[in-house]
């Protein structure tokens, strides 16, 4: 008889769920673009169950991770650190992974992984610089969609420095560049390098070991990924499942619990 497990990743800006069959096959997934403290987690759970044509009672084990994991007491059988879940999820997609760079809405994590287990990490959760929130703020100033940043930045022909690592000061720099008539596409490329520089500082403290993978919502932005590759001097892999990585790791740990 098959074992189905549910992994829930309650982030600061999005709620993600994955249902796994026998610890091997992804049956369904869901993403709701609001996170902890909202209806997002409940909606994401409802959506993933609907997508799988299953009920909550069909789940052998449910495990929650992420910033808002403790809000799911009574719904999840267990809560677990997102660091461990990201290490596990990344190892499922990329068996040779040794470094995970996770850029979420409100924090950045660089995790060293050995055989699916976290062995070291560095994290920035005190400042928005280098996070998805930073990109949201910058896109708002530039009056562009955050989803368009990568494509626009790729057209840049002139190097513009956005040197402040603080979001407030970087905001002032961007406004100053706009007032000088600097092309938006060059500013965007500079913003991508600014995000990368913040992440590189964390990565160098952990130590970069190949294979390197990028997870989290910002992994979709190939401008940031390219700036990281340039700054670190390594190829960085990603996947369409990058934003679901924490939920995937949670579902895998749930399977380990259920299969005991």
Swiss-Prot record:
* EC category name: hydrolase
Reaction(s) catalyzed by this protein?
A: ATP + H2O = ADP + phosphate + H(+)
EC number of this enzyme: 3.6.1.-
Pathway(s) of this molecule = Amino-acid degradation; L-glutamate degradation via hydroxyglutarate pathway; crotonoyl-CoA from L-glutamate: step 4/5
Sequence positions that bind [4Fe-4S] cluster? 127, 166
Question: Which family does the entry's similarity section mention?
Answer: Belongs to the HgdC family.
Function (record text): Involved in the fermentation of L-glutamate via the hydroxyglutarate pathway. HgdC (CompA) has a very low ATPase activity, whose the role is to activate dehydratase HgdA-HgdB complex and then maintain an appropriate redox state via an ATP-dependent electron transfer. The dehydratase requires only catalytic amounts of ATP and substoichiometric amounts of HgdC (CompA) to be functional.
UniProt name for this protein? (R)-2-hydroxyglutaryl-CoA dehydratase activating ATPase
